[in-house]
């Protein structure tokens, strides 16, 4: 699929072709947290859960002293704090570390906890190996059976220096030729896209497709329209109509392969989208300078 000449993704090297013609498609899962009740509540705390084939998103509006604990966590998970006013204490086997807002943290397997120090929003990202959380997702029924065309989840290599708490500021300025702000760990990739102030230029959209992995687009601020188109296959009974779905914040769109898709910000103010991939994307990882912590996590 062609990108605008100034889009950094125009320089991506195409991956090996998937030797399989699809015979069926999954639909797009849209989870608009602002339209549905939370999946969990306690005094001053509301949590919503949504999932893709491999990834779980837990979105929480939390009060001070709320604690989120994980016992026997099977793999690395991610904590995303998009608001600068937020702060937490993260406890792992190494001890306690204070993390301010506008940070992303990669939390190791095993025992850990997150204690909220300032009221605000937080996002925790897990793989579906966290079976207890997968059951809580509002769209869990959509994944009662695996979706077609998605490759099985396989984690990436263990970091050479071992699993430990890693934290990174989201305050990374845009750079010519780099796409967004990307971090990866052994389980997933997070692309905290450059903020879009006002609507996107509709003459510079980016329709593209993925052969065998989902793209999960998390809207944390603003309003977006997700444009989705499925290819035609011989079986007309499997054809799907185009979609042009407006999603405000906070919301999740799970975009399935091999649909052609592009997303445009339409909000008048700040529009912030975060793209998630589980496991990490190889093509993004192969681009020099794109993954900001690539020196810590090897590729397969």
Per-region residue spans from a language model:
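A short, N-terminal "cap"/entry segment at the start of jelly-roll beta-barrel domains
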Residues: 1-56, 131-201, 299-300
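C-terminal functional regions that serve as terminal interaction/effector modules
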Residues: 2-30, 82, 207, 214-300
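A short catalytic or substrate-binding loop motif that flags glycine-/basic-rich loops and adjacent residues
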Residues: 51-52, 71-73, 209-211
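A cross-kingdom feature marking solvent-exposed beta-strand/loop segments within repeated
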Residues: 56-75, 85-124, 196-203, 227-262, ...
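Generic structural microfeature
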Residues: 57, 211-214
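Short, conserved beta-strand segments within well-ordered enzyme catalytic domains
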Residues: 79
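Double-stranded beta-helix
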Residues: 119-164, 264-300
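Active-site environment of non-heme Fe oxygenases that use a 2-His-1-carboxylate facial triad
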Residues: 203-209
């Amino acid at each position: 699929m062609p990108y605008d000449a100034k889009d950094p993704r125009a320089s991506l090297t195409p991956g090996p072709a998937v030797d399989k013609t699809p015979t069926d498609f999954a639909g797009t899962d849209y989870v608009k947290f602002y339209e549905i009740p939370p999946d969990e509540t306690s005094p001053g705390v509301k949590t919503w859960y949504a999932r893709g084939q491999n990834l779980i998103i837990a979105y929480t509006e939390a009060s001070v002293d709320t604690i989120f604990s994980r016992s026997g966590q099977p793999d690395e998970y991610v904590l995303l704090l998009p608001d600068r006013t937020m702060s937490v204490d993260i406890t792992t086997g190494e001890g306690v570390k204070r993390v301010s807002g506008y940070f992303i943290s990669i939390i190791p397997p095993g025992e850990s906890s997150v204690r909220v120090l300032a009221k605000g929003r937080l996002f925790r990202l897990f793989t579906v190996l966290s079976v207890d959380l997968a059951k809580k997702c509002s769209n869990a029924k959509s994944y009662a059976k695996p979706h077609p065309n998605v490759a099985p989840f396989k984690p990436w290599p263990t970091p050479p220096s071992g699993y430990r708490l890693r934290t990174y500021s989201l305050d990374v300025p845009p750079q010519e030729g780099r796409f967004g702000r990307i971090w990866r760990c052994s389980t997933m990739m997070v692309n905290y896209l450059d903020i879009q102030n006002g609507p996107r230029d509709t003459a510079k959209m980016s329709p593209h497709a993925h052969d065998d992995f989902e793209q999960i687009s998390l809207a944390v601020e603003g309003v977006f329209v997700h444009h989705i188109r499925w290819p035609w296959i011989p079986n007309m009974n499997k054809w799907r109509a185009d979609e042009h779905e407006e999603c405000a914040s906070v919301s999740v769109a799970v975009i399935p392969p091999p649909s052609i898709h592009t997303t445009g910000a339409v909000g008048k103010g700040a529009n912030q989208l975060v793209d998630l991939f589980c496991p990490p994307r190889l093509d993004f990882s192969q681009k020099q300078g794109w993954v900001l912590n690539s020196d810590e996590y090897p590729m397969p």
